[in-house]
């Protein structure tokens, strides 16, 4: 199997630290007038997205171009899959064009892992079903490091639609490697009990106040209605019980930060006051996405 990035679970702590350290090297490019390097000059990256994406797809495009590579983005509606071609045949066709990496998002959990066994091209997982979203967890970790100075021993509350969240799973895998205390919180219908066994140090609760108490990091998640066959919790009641409001922050550590992988739904997962609060690092996450994905592309291709 060619080297790629399929998930956080398979990475060791040292590998994660190396990616995060390299991402820090790339951060200053954001404020420079000349943002382009020639690290991957002459390389080609194909972004193949079978699910809607703004942040991840655009971030990978910018990351590739800042490293000097060429990037082509293909959506499901613009691929031959929409004409009945199988996913394997589509990927084989792209592989025959000899790109240096394929960045792939798919609604089926495990799709990148399955295809990586058959393709000679490295695959970077940009999100597969409810399974993993490795680069999101890496950029979240970079953001936490920037504000908290460490990952070891932090209390991280992840709140929302845990059941359908690949972001939650990747963050659990990453943070547990650093000894963080992870509290997963949401309605019982969106909080599978087996997730307590996902990694060491994971605790489940349906009480948002318990989750937030003494937290260093509060990570809110979107309710993924598109993955639910029927509503798992009344939409009209969700914000009342699980929406983050300013008063909740008094329960957390004084310097606790608020995160969200986006897209955010104000008035459902968190209030506008919280989204725009000085301890919100939501836009920092977006910014760090570019540096982290530059580090990943360099590692996979360079």
From Swiss-Prot:
Its EC number is 2.1.3.2. SUPFAM superfamilies: Aspartate/ornithine carbamoyltransferase. InterPro entries: Asp/Orn_carbamoyltranf_P-bd, Asp/Orn_carbamoylTrfase, Asp/Orn_carbamoylTrfase_sf, Asp_carbamoyltransf, Asp_carbamoyltransf_Asp/Orn-bd. GO terms for cellular component: cytosol. Pathway: Pyrimidine metabolism; UMP biosynthesis via de novo pathway; (S)-dihydroorotate from bicarbonate: step 2/3. It comes from the Bacteria. Carbamoyl phosphate binds at residues 55-56, 105, 133, 136, 262-263. Keywords: Pyrimidine biosynthesis, Transferase. L-aspartate binds at residues 83, 166, 222. It catalyses: carbamoyl phosphate + L-aspartate = N-carbamoyl-L-aspartate + phosphate + H(+). GO terms for biological process: 'de novo' pyrimidine nucleobase biosynthetic process; 'de novo' UMP biosynthetic process; amino acid metabolic process. PROSITE patterns: CARBAMOYLTRANSFERASE (PS00097). It holds the Pfam family OTCace. GO terms for molecular function: amino acid binding; aspartate carbamoyltransferase activity. Catalyzes the condensation of carbamoyl phosphate and aspartate to form carbamoyl aspartate and inorganic phosphate, the committed step in the de novo pyrimidine nucleotide biosynthesis pathway. Heterododecamer (2C3:3R2) of six catalytic PyrB chains organized as two trimers (C3), and six regulatory PyrI chains organized as three dimers (R2). Belongs to the aspartate/ornithine carbamoyltransferase superfamily. ATCase family. This is Aspartate carbamoyltransferase catalytic subunit.
């Amino acid at each position: 199997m060619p080297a790629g990035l399929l998930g956080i679970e398979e990475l060791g702590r040292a590998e994660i630290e190396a990616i995060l350290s390299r991402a820090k090297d790339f951060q200053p490019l954001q404020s420079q007038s000349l943002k382009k390097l020639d690290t991957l000059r002459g390389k080609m990256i194909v972004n193949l997205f079978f699910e809607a994406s703004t942040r991840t797809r655009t971030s990978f495009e910018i990351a590739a171009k800042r490293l000097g590579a060429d990037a082509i983005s293909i959506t499901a509606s613009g691929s031959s899959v929409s004409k009945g071609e199988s996913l394997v045949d589509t990927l084989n066709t792209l592989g025959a064009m000899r790109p240096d990496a394929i960045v792939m998002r798919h609604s089926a959990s495990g799709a990148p892992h399955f295809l990586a066994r058959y393709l000679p091209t490295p695959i970077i997982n940009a999100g597969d079903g409810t399974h993993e979203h490795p680069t999101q967890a890496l950029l979240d970790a970079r953001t936490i490091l920037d504000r908290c100075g460490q990952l070891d021993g932090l209390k991280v509350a992840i709140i929302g639609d845990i059941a359908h969240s690949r972001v939650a799973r990747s963050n659990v895998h990453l943070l547990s490697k650093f000894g963080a205390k992870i509290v997963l919180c949401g309605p019982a219908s969106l909080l599978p009990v087996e997730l307590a066994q996902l990694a060491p140090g994971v605790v489940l609760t349906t009480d948002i106040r318990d989750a937030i108490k003494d937290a260093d990091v509060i990570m809110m998640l979107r309710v993924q209605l598109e993955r639910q066959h029927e509503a798992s919790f009344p939409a009209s009641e969700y914000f009342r019980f699980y929406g983050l409001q300013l008063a909740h922050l008094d329960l957390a550590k004084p310097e606790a930060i608020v995160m969200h992988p986006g897209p955010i739904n104000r008035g459902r997962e968190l209030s506008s006051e919280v989204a725009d609060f000085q301890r919100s690092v939501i836009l920092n996450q977006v910014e760090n996405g570019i540096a982290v994905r530059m580090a990943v592309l360099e590692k996979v291709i360079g």
